[in-house]
Structure formats: structure tokens, C-alpha cells
Design a protein with these regions (language model features):
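ABC ATPase NBD Q-loop/coupling interface
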Residues: 64-81
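A short, surface-exposed alpha-helical micro-motif characterized by mixed small hydrophobic
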Residues: 208-210
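H-loop/switch region of ABC-family ATPase nucleotide-binding domains
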Residues: 202-203
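Helix-to-loop junction immediately C-terminal to a conserved catalytic motif
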Residues: 55
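Conserved beta-strand-loop-alpha-helix hinge in the C-terminal portion
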Residues: 222-243
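Conserved ABC ATPase "signature" region
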Residues: 118-136
Length: 244
């Protein structure tokens, strides 16, 4: 069953002005539930615009987006429901930390979902385990942690909401190779244990090849290819022509 589906999705920035630009054009894709898919494309191809439609941060100019069979539309009263289903981790998410303690920061999402305190605490502990942070970190201030640890706390805050779809936009940006491998390994472990759908946006073809099972290639606002890692990376000439 498709957990993500778009039909003729088009998004035009600054429509009706001299600065009008089509970021997505007649974008049609279906992604199966439980998939671990990498998303690649050169700068300006439409990657970020696409993922922001999946939890209603952006509304389509034309077309529809479906999550778990339901239409998503930014501005709808119940768009918050989709943001519980679709967890989005932006680049440098550590800049969004605000809790006095690590535990408070990670607990923010599930607490606002109305979950009982014992369930919130359980989710906080599980999420920190997934990102490789020990329980003795829970009462520390997130602002005293290293850059890599802050990144993991921010990711844990999204995992604690247990989204059906987890989207990570360049989650290892700015990290050293060791930190990058650690975080991506933890995300893979999370996927294998929870069986949730994971979309990983990355400029690193190496990371996509190592961790994803399928690859969505976006070019000029459209899905140019969507297939297994092996099949995509065998099309070297086409990828090179797209600047990848």
C-alpha cells in the first residue's frame, strides 16, 4: 500500500509576479509503506519543496498529495493530524532546541499529542536510545552538548512522536565522517526496528547507496527516476547528465 502518493503536484513560487518560478511540475510518485528511500537531485531541483508538501507546510498550486490515503492540504484545520503522521527533520535541527533539559525537549512533541506522562517518558527513553544517547543525559541542558549530540537530541524529539513517515533533510550536514556514519546508522536501526517509512534527502550519493533501499531522483521539478539503489546507480550516464 502507498503511504505517500502525489497526483499532478505542481508548486509555483511567486505566482503572478515577474519572479514566478515553478519548483514542481506535474509531479507524480507513489512510495510504499515501510520503504527506506533516498532523495537526490542537484540544488534547485525541487527536493525541499516536495518534502514540505508531505506534512502540509506548503500547499499545492495544483494537484494533490495523499498521506496514508488522505489528502493533505496546508491551511486545513486538521493539518496538524498529518504533522503527527509525518515527522520532518530540517537541516541543522539543533538550532530549534529550546528545552531546559534534554528530556524536556524530547518530551515536547508527545506531551502536546496529549499522551499520558508514563507514555511520554517511555517514548523519551526509547527515542534517546535510538539516537545513541544514554539516560544519564536526560537532565542535562541540551545547550551544553556537542554539536553532534545536539543534532541527535533534535532527531530524538521527532522520533518520540512515532511518525508513520520520517523525513530527514540533510541530517548529517556539517558533521564529521564519524558523526555522519553514527547518525545514519542509528536511523537505519530505527527503520529496521519500527518498520516506519523513511525518506532521506542527501547530496551524498555514497550515503544514499549505503543506507537507502530505493532512490528517488528529482530533476527540474519532476521525478526523473524511482527504483532500487542498484538500478539507479547503474544509470551512470543519465545521472551525470543531471549533474549528479
Amino acid at each position: 500500500m502507498s503511504i505517500i502518493k502525489t497526483e499532478h503536484l505542481t508548486h509555483i513560487y511567486s505566482q503572478g509576479t515577474p519572479y514566478e518560478r515553478a519548483a514542481l511540475q506535474d509531479f507524480n510518485i507513489e512510495i510504499e509503506e515501510g520503504e527506506f528511500a533516498g532523495i537526490i537531485g542537484h540544488t534547485g531541483s525541487g527536493k525541499s519543496t516536495f518534502i514540505q508538501h508531505l506534512n502540509g507546510l506548503l500547499a499545492p498550486t495544483e494537484g494533490k498529495v495523499y498521506i496514508d490515503g488522505e489528502v493533505v492540504c496546508a491551511g486545513r484545520r486538521d493539518v496538524g493530524r498529518f504533522r503527527l503522521k509525518v515527522g520532518l527533520v530540517f537541516q541543522y535541527p539543533e538550532y530549534q532546541l529550546f528545552g531546559e533539559t534534554v528530556a524536556a525537549d524530547v518530551a515536547f512533541g508527545p506531551t502536546n499529542m496529549g499522551l499520558p506522562p508514563e507514555e511520554v517518558e517511555k517514548r523519551v527513553r526509547e527515542s534517546l536510545r535510538f539516537v545513541g544517547l544514554s539516560e544519564d543525559m536526560m537532565e542535562k541542558s541540551p545547550f551544553e552538548l556537542s554539536g553532534g549530540q545536539k543534532r541527535r537530541v533534535a532527531i530524538a524529539g521527532v522520533l518520540a512522536m512515532d511518525p508513520k513517515v520520517l523525513i530527514l533533510d540533510e541530517p548529517t550536514a556539517g558533521l564529521d565522517p564519524r558523526g555522519r556514519d553514527t547518525i545514519l546508522g542509528e536511523i537505519r536501526e530505527y527503520h529496521e526496528e519500527r518498520k516506519n517509512t523513511v525518506l532521506l534527502v542527501s547530496h551524498s550519493m555514497e550515503d544514499i547507496a549505503q543506507y537507502a533501499k530505493k532512490v528517488l531522483v528529482i530533476a527540474e521539478g519532476k521525478p526523473a527516476m524511482y527504483d532500487t539503489v542498484e538500478n539507479i546507480f547503474s544509470r551512470v550516464e543519465e545521472l551525470t547528465a543531471m549533474g549528479l
